[in-house]
Amino acid sequence: MREELNVEELFASKVFTLGKMKERLPKSTYKEVKNVMDQGGELSLATADVVATAMKDWAIENGATHYTHWFQPLTGITAEKHDAFVTHPDEDGRMIMEFSGKELIKGEPDASSFPSGGLRATFEARGYTTWDITSPAFIKETATGPTLCIPTAFCSYKGEALDKKTPLLRSMEALSKQAIRIVRLFGNTEATKVLPSVGAEQEYFLVDSAKALQREDIIFSGRTLFGAPAPKGQEMDDHYFGVIRERIGGFMHDVNIELWKLGVTSKTQHNEAAPAQHEVAPIYESANVAVDHNQLVMETLKRVAGKHGLRCMLHEKPFAGVNGSGKHNNWSITTDNGVNLLEPGQTPNENIQFLLVLACIMKAVDTHADLLRQSASNVGNDHRLGGYEAPPAIISIFLGEQLEDVVSQLVETGKADNLKEGGMLRTGVSTLPDFVKDATDRNRTSPFAFTGNKFEFRMVGSEDSIGSPNTTLNAIVAEAFCEAADRLEGAEDFDMAVHDLIKEYMTEHQRIIFNGNGYAKEWEEEAARRGLPNIPSMVAAVDTLTTPKAIHLFEKFGIFTEAELRSRAEVLYETYAKTINIEALTMVDMANKQIIPAVMKYSKSLADAVIAITEAGGDTYVPNRMLQQITQKLTEMEKASEALLEEEKKASAMPRGKEQAFCYHDKVMVAMNALRRPADELEKLVDKKYWPFPTYADLLFEV
């Protein structure tokens, strides 16, 4: 029987919150820290020393002996180096535990050991981590013991961003600056900044760890590279929202406890559509904190899974034939005095501020659909997007019937006098209440959907950091706000000017709205007619980062320099090539050392059976037929393995960069698929006791 939980006491117990600062810091110090958090600026070194001492004392009280600058390099995961609080013993030989303001504010990791796209080399290795004061420090409890983790940004010696956080923070400042101009136009003089709020729904698979460790593909690539479909998949729709199995429920319970300790507002948990697939979702929070917390969610899922004898698979497509995993990025913008700029109110057709914000977002998404698509691209997501399980690779906006009708009225007549209502839902059961329906349905096929008072960006991959998507979203909307504010701030007749601007933006960018079925082939054709970009793969999307349009956008708002953009493009090309190379070599290894030898053993057993049956005077048609089929597929597989290895050698010998990445996409991936086909066919033919590793049925249904 579990002990009773006091969630209120447990929540954020391992976080150095504002409340703990208020208790432990002198009043003047706390006031300075709070002012820097709210208004920006730098802490004095004297103040940083006081904060560092208080933080260290709190951490030691919670069992920590070490601290780390916790940052997010371009690997997409987090990085940390642990330093103890110990200093040189005093003259009496006593150890003194210290932590200075300088150590709190700045660290110096080796920048050349992380992806930099040419910005750093081994002979110019210095990099800096700098404390993000707006994201609270926390204590992470792992097998190494409790460690004080200080969220930081990571940059080069020359100040170039080498991480996911620095551009995000820059984009948040840019968005706030431009959004404040918009709210000032409507008389809001109290707000001092506008924050993007984010809530990321995290999907994942859980499989038995002992079984997963028998498969090299899961170990090395995080997904299955071979595997015939199980007799049952997700076609019965019985896993989604189904009863959570006890083993999985115990895992989820422990995950919640760990996340609540870390201040992560884990709110919702449920089974997802595919067998062995699940989801956890938090409550929204400031974008930079949400990015940090999503990294903690992914780390915690993996760590707790191990304690339960499970393996958490975060790959976007770990199993062929069933749904992959995504990460719905719920995004809204809110003033510091509590006004959500995406709240339409009861009469959105009359809410001019909301309509202007909506028009600006339509303009932003239409103008920079290619960049938004790129922000959600990674190697794993290529297997998921557009696969009748996830949004297509074409960016469009779903507004729902009510708002689409408002937009249509404004475009056609310049005014929106009518508003579609939701009507009553009547169940026909006397004991069930009737209630007013929402004015619009949901569209699960849309990549960018308005869902009441936020936009849900559904393209993001499950394993990816949400830093890049939110950086891009903030940047493109900041640009649209800036252009709108430039037009309206000096207007002689503001009411007429804002009316005309809303109509202009909605007319010019109405093509980005699509409320239909994003999975339909007809949508691809319609999108092409509308002139919307359809970028099919990660490698094809990378170039969008270095177009003149993108460089102008990011440089204008101080989010990226051209050098930073080009370096990121190089990192993405290299990441793609390295990932596919690992997968290709893993496939060859599994084929030559596991599958082919296992099939040959089974073939021998069939041949022995033919001889025995012949000697007994029996009919050998069945074993002969089976042996013939298996031999044919085995020959096909051996040739495909040789061909894949040859393509891999050619690709790996090429200079790193765009051309190599495209070679892996166009040649190596094709060869990988050609090897998988006969292997999966053989799995269906070979006696299970001979097959060298667990099958889809073993992994997905024996958890």
Residue ranges of predicted features:
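Active-site proximal loops enriched in glycine and acidic residues that flank catalytic Cys/His/Asp
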Residues: 47, 71, 100, 282, ...
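Short, intrinsically disordered, low-complexity segments enriched in Ser/Thr and Pro
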Residues: 87-122, 237, 360-361, 484-493, ...
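Hydrophobic/aromatic-rich, well-ordered segments within soluble, folded domains that form packed cores
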Residues: 64, 68-70, 291-307, 333, ...
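Short, compositionally biased "basic patch" segments
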Residues: 1-8
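C-terminal amphipathic alpha-helical interaction region
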Residues: 505-703
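Glycine-rich, acidic/polar active-site loops that bind/position phosphate-bearing ligands
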Residues: 125-314, 323-326, 333-570
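Short linear, low-complexity motifs centered on an aromatic residue
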Residues: 76-92, 109-112, 117, 215-217, ...
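Active-site core of metal-dependent hydrolases
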Residues: 10-125
